[in-house]
């Protein structure tokens, strides 16, 4: 039997949820209840609503994105680079019983001050599908990421995503 879990991408303006049994997605849902659009509801209430009939206390929930920011449910501290890919899963922030937020990543050097929140989970998926030394991650806040087989070394946010949107 493969483990059942819920994956959440909870950004500023949208919330997307997937129910998995192992590697198979059983169902997905989405909402416009991003962390800046809760309209007076608590994050716990919004989570309960979007995962209704999916979850018992034993079903883990792993969330990524702005839910871990200073405007989200609870701050999940950034993981500074360089960092091992495995460090991401070891730095989860608990927000409830069997509910966690994945940390974002940060770079702080004289030539680069940058953060990502949510894209780190896309990076884990990209690495699992096609290991590389450079990852180009399109989206609203497009990232270029430099890594090796074990570690993430650097990333840059580039304007191309904003130009597209």
Regions found by a protein language model. Name each.
Residues 38, 106-165:
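Glycine-rich phosphate-binding loop plus the immediately following alpha-helix
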Residues 19-20, 74-76, 147-150:
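Short amphipathic alpha-helical segments
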Residues 4-42:
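Short glycine-rich, Thr/Ser-proximal phosphate-binding strand/loop in the N-terminal lobe
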Residues 5-9, 60-62, 133-137:
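Short glycine-aspartate micro-motif
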Residues 54-116:
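Short beta-strand-loop/turn "lid" adjacent to the catalytic site in phosphate-handling enzymes
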Residues 11-16, 67-69, 140-143:
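Gly/Ser/Thr-rich loops at beta-strand to alpha-helix junctions
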Residues 41-54:
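Short, well-ordered amphipathic alpha-helical segments that serve as non-catalytic structural scaffolds
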């Amino acid at each position: 039997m493969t483990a059942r879990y819920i994956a959440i991408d909870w950004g500023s303006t949208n919330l997307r949820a997937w129910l998995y049994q192992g590697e198979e997605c059983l169902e997905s849902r989405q909402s416009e209840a991003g962390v800046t659009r809760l309209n007076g509801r608590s994050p716990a209430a919004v989570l309960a609503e979007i995962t209704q009939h999916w979850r018992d206390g034993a079903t883990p929930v792993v969330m990524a994105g702005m839910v871990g920011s200073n405007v989200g449910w609870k701050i999940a501290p950034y993981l500074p680079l360089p960092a091992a890919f495995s460090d991401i899963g070891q730095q989860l922030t608990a927000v409830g019983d069997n509910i966690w937020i994945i940390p974002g990543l940060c770079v702080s050097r004289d030539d680069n001050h940058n953060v990502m929140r949510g894209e780190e989970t896309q990076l884990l998926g990209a690495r699992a599908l096609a290991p590389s030394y450079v990852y180009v991650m399109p989206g609203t806040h497009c990232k270029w990421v430099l890594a090796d087989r074990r570690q993430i070394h650097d990333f840059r946010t580039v304007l191309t995503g904003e130009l597209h949107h």
